[in-house]
């Protein structure tokens, strides 16, 4: 199952692990070493010539004692967000995931009502699911932790692995049934479809305004420039919800909707 997962099949570790500021999450062995040394992603200086993917040894203490204890997770300690001092994710076994699935940066502050966007990647970086669960890291709007953070024991692990410890890490519908009895899909009461429609509307407005561009390969880039704060926030929040978090509200439906609703107001 692991081989079919994105962690198991992606070659991103080859592309990114050679950079010291990327190796924590993109090199499985660097992650293990960094966790053992109690280093956060921004403190890592390890660069391996032969990087490894996020394999068994990245998450588990394989071949340490040669006993059943080797299946123990590398860490389940609560995670302090290095880009957001004072913010902590404490989601049980899901804490392991949050070490990497956290924002690397925050939206730029406005100066005289304008935000200077200087990067084509104006977003929190890939995989900030833990901050979405907490209801934070959006531009111009803070939220609250979702029920999927506060009520689901072991957060990420419960929903993405289920009782069978599914190592594809694809969300397991069976994990939802304790609260959402008899559902047959993740789009409960059409909530995800409604949010998707608003995300699509916002995307069209951002393209029309020239704040993002279509790269023609299924990806989009931010267009650098000096923008009114509300529009820059809209650019950030669209990317955060639609491109980086990717759950279409499943991680925090209330916060995701609030971010997109506020963004749409920037384009009357």
Predicted regions mapped to residue ranges:
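Generic recognition of stable, solvent-exposed alpha-helical segments in well-folded globular domains
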Residues: 20, 54, 91-95, 151-154, ...
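Detector for Asparagine
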Residues: 27, 50, 95, 99, ...
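Mature extracytoplasmic or organellar-lumen-exposed domains after removal of signal/transit peptides
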Residues: 184-192, 196-268
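Sequence context of c-type cytochrome heme-c attachment sites
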Residues: 1-92, 99-169
């Amino acid at each position: 199952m692991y081989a079919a997962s994105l962690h198991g099949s992606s070659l991103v570790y080859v592309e990114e692990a050679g950079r010291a500021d990327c190796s924590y999450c993109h090199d499985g062995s660097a992650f293990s070493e960094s966790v053992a040394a109690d280093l956060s992603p921004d403190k890592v200086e390890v660069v391996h010539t032969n990087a490894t993917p996020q394999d068994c040894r990245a998450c588990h203490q394989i071949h340490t004692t040669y006993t059943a204890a080797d299946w123990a997770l590398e860490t389940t300690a609560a995670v302090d967000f290095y880009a957001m001092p004072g913010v902590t994710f404490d989601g049980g076994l899901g804490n392991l995931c949050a070490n990497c699935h956290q924002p690397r940066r925050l939206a730029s502050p406005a100066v005289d009502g304008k935000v200077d966007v200087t990067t084509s990647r104006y977003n929190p970086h890939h995989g900030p699911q833990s901050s979405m669960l907490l209801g934070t890291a959006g531009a111009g709007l803070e939220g609250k932790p979702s029920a999927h953070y506060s009520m689901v024991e072991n957060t990420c692990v419960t929903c993405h692995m289920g009782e069978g410890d599914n190592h594809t890490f694809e969300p397991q519908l069976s994990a939802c049934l304790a609260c959402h009895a008899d559902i047959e899909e993740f789009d409960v009461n059409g909530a995800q479809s409604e949010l998707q429609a608003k995300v699509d509307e916002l995307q069209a407005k951002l393209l029309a305004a020239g704040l993002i561009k279509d790269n023609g390969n299924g990806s989009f880039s931010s267009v650098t420039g000096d923008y009114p704060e509300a529009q820059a926030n809209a650019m950030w929040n669209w990317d955060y919800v639609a491109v980086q978090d990717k759950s279409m509200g499943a991680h925090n439906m209330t916060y995701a909707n609030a971010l997109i609703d506020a963004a749409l107001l920037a384009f009357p």
